[in-house]
A protein has these predicted regions:
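Rhodanese-like catalytic fold shared by cysteine-dependent sulfurtransferases
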Residues: 2, 19-21, 28-59, 68-104
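Sec-dependent N-terminal signal peptides
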Residues: 3-13
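Metallo-beta-lactamase
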Residues: 63-64
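Sec/Tat signal peptide C-region and signal peptidase I cleavage site
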Residues: 13-19
Length: 104
């Protein structure tokens, strides 16, 4: 299992307890400026790094700054067989959708 992913999953936030994985696909600098509490950070072009550690039927929400990169990452995951990959749009849209909070 990807070590970064395992560490975050171990810290079981409410969405993770429901079986939902939230991924912030922005740059490291954007991530450090604030991210959803339950999110893990994987830049969009590295999204397939989860393929060996996450079930293909897991509910996965992806977000970025505007929804563009998360859309690309969602397509990559869907093309790889992840049937429940969802583009949650921008960080604000994802925050509203998932009823989370933004932390720094």
């Amino acid at each position: 299992m990807h070590l970064k992913l395992a560490c975050f999953l171990f810290l079981a936030f409410p969405l993770i307890a429901q079986g939902i994985l939230v991924i912030d696909v922005r740059t490291t600098q954007e991530w450090q400026s604030g991210h959803l509490e339950e999110a893990i950070h994987i830049e969009w072009q590295d999204i397939l790094s989860i393929s060996e550690s996450v079930s293909k039927d897991k509910e996965i929400y992806l977000y970025c700054r505007s929804g563009n990169r998360s859309g690309k990452a969602t397509k990559i995951l869907i093309d790889a067989g992840f049937i429940n990959a969802i583009n949650a749009g921008s960080i604000q849209e994802a925050n509203n959708l998932l009823k989370s909070k933004i932390i720094k």
